Amino acid sequence: PNVTPTGFKKSRAEFEDLIYQNMRVAGSTTGTGGDQTIPTGLQVGLGVRPTTVHKFFSQGDYQNTGNSLDFAIEGEGFFQVMVNGEEAYTRAGAFKLNQDGTLVTANGYVLQPEFTVPVETKEIIVTENGRITAMDAAGEELASADIPLYTFINPAGLEAKGRNLYTTTGASGDATEGIHGEDNVGTIAQGFLEMSNVEVVDEMVNMIVGLRAYEMNSKAIQTADSMLQLAVQLNRS
């Protein structure tokens, strides 16, 4: 299901090992009279724990939809939308018109700055530098505005809110409005959507590797259990 959502970004869990129980300390002596130094020691690990979930904002493939309200960001940047009075950011550019003719996301969040399409509009044109223009049947301009793109020093530090929305944190840094096509800021492609950046083949391979590791550990436990049962039976006999 994560392959199909517009603008979905994959994540990877990262782990760290827990504290170790020192059975034999490296560099200590044997204490058997020879005072030999133990070269490596013996530590027993107590497992691992998750430390973070890293979000990857690499670009996904582009799909040509032909819909004039579909906008794909070619390069870095986020659209800004208003969610319950707070600013949020998204790369999912599948916009709609609400009952007032205002550009909104599929969930009704208003694209910033707010742009309302006049009733007489017959065509909507968006240039790569974010200029959106509503035209009438005669080709005359009815309304226009600029759609800004925002970048972050550390986009991986954004907080995911679901529905392909993100909010700023102390780790992400503040949103910076950029100039389209300059300083690594992307441009806007009308009639296209950015799809998920999840690679099906890679995820299938990773799943198979994880499954094989699980099966190996399971068989090791079964073998150890069988050996323990055999030892108990031999002791009884």
Question: What are these model-derived regions, one by one?
Answer:
Residues 1-237:
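Amphipathic alpha-helical polymerization modules
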